[in-house]
């Protein structure tokens, strides 16, 4: 945002969907601000919330109180921005990914799309959108680069949360997931296969990067941080690493976008930023 980096489309998965919102509204530092402020609030992300609501992140507090009142999301800026915004969710009945566009975050359906994308299995309630039963998009498609390419976004900036060389191992929670979601065998199968799809996507991403169609931004080092981290020093360290690595890639990003605009004899191809889930 500090360097006026703009793209045609954004797709986010899980926490990437939540962070992507503040990028589209151009509210720099918003996610970091409320994460630090409310990290110990029992309604923000806690066992209290899980026990009392069925969600590790309380729906009312996280998806209404914060964006509507405590640290307002700029709804007008979201609608006014021509950048199209999508989130990735997992369909429990089919096991497949659903890529859903959000056009107005005042619309309860769009709020539920984002909530579904970030609703982790076992510690979240199922979210229903347009008759679909949905959960965290990371299960079915953690890095939705190919979905965006099918939509016509041929040149992509991909933001990963793991350093170079990382590969995901088998799901350690599979037995619990198989029991909890036994009525949804396709979803359980996807949980079982998740690491294979994830690692194959990383392999393909590296090929696209070599071809020049994709620019990858990833952490330059490993920081051992938990998925539900509350320690302020760990959150701050991860944030500062992200800022540092983004600055290191800034000139490459500008050049990548300039080349995109010059493609096809002056007719710009679509450009996009793709964010990976944090899991």
Where are these regions (language model features)?
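Gly/Ala-rich beta-loop-alpha elbow adjacent to hydrolase catalytic centers
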Residues: 12, 16
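Patatin-like phospholipase
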Residues: 1-10, 21-279
